[in-house]
Every structure is written in structure tokens, then in C-alpha cells.
Amino acid sequence: EVLSYWSGLGYYSRGRNLLKSAKILKQNFNSKMPNSSEDLQALPGIGRSTAGAILSLGFKTKAPILDGNAKRVLVRYFRINDPIDLTSTSKLLWKIAEDNLPEKECNIYTQAIMDVGALICTRTSPKCSECPLSKNCISFNENKQNLIPVKLPKKEKPVRKVYWLVLKNKEGEVLLENRNAKGVWQGLWSFPEFNEEEQRAKYTKQLPLSNPNSIENT
């Protein structure tokens, strides 16, 4: 039911995690959101940054976030030349995020750094002339804002070959199967999928087809 309402939005794992988390909250937290980072991160789909956002924006407590927008602001402001996707860089950014939290109105700071990253300190063509942080931004003052963040070279994406079986009856209905396995489109419906042609052939032999010889490879 959740996925049917979620249809078309993408990120279907988020829909499943919402339902899982709701059940945990009802069972273990009296249907209330916990107010500790540890308990929040125990919920499916919630990591350290999301937990920090919930604590800061929802409970107005002092907690750091480090989403993509906040990362970009911090690496440019402090001119961190190491690749942003390194574990060591992430650890450094978490320390910086914690050290620079204000003692009061942390919720306003959290919303502000996300907005600056999303609207001003953008991935390309940052609007430094509009940025309230540009005066002390090391990257801007050294004219390196377009060179940072540094990223590791992208790995070549693997090519995966699969076979889909498309079966249609006289009424125009097609055969679909639920994808229970982990991976792409988990829990959704698709044509029967096979990694090898032999698997497809074996599968079709078990089906009560009126004309099995009509199956063609395309």
C-alpha cells in the first residue's frame, strides 16, 4: 500500500523504510519519535546526518548534519583539498561540523547551511557574490571555488546483461513477477528476469503455454 502511493517518486527503499520505522516507533517508542541520535540511527534508512537534522530541526537541540549541501559549504569555506568522498575527509568534516555548531538556535543554523549549499554554494557556478560567507571563505578568497570539492575519479560502471520474458495472453494481459530479491526495484513488479538464456528456456518449459514455440529472442 505504501509503495502504491509512492509510485512514480523513485527511491522506493525510502517508502519501505518509512513503514518499517513506523512499526518500530509504535512498538518500542509509544508511537513517538526518539530524541537521541543513537535511537534515531537504529531506525531503517536513518543515518547520522538525518538523525542530526531531526534532532536540530525537530527537537531544536544541538546536533550536526553533513548532507551533500553542508559538505560542499564546509569544504569550500575551509578549502579542504582532499577528495570529498574519502573516509578521512568525511571524518574531518564531521569534526568541523561539530566544532562550528552554535550554542543557541542550532535549528536556524542547520536550515541555513542547507539552504546556502542548495541555493548559493551550488555544485557548479556557485553564486559567491550573494553568499553571506564569502568574506571568510578561503576557497573564494583564493579563487578556487570552482576547483573544490575535489572528487575521486569515477569508477567505470559495470555492464549487466539480463533477459526479460514478455508473455501476453489473448486478453492482452502480461505476466509480471514481484521482485522480492535485494537490488534494483526491490518489492516492485516486472517481467520475469534471467541472467542466462538457459534459465529463461527452463522457466518457460514449466509454464502452461498454448504455443511455446512462439517465444522469440529480441
Regions found by a protein language model. Name each.
Residues 118-218:
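Intrinsically disordered, low-complexity, charged terminal extensions of DNA damage-control enzymes
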Residues 1-127, 133-142, 209-212:
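Catalytic cores of DNA base-excision repair glycosylases
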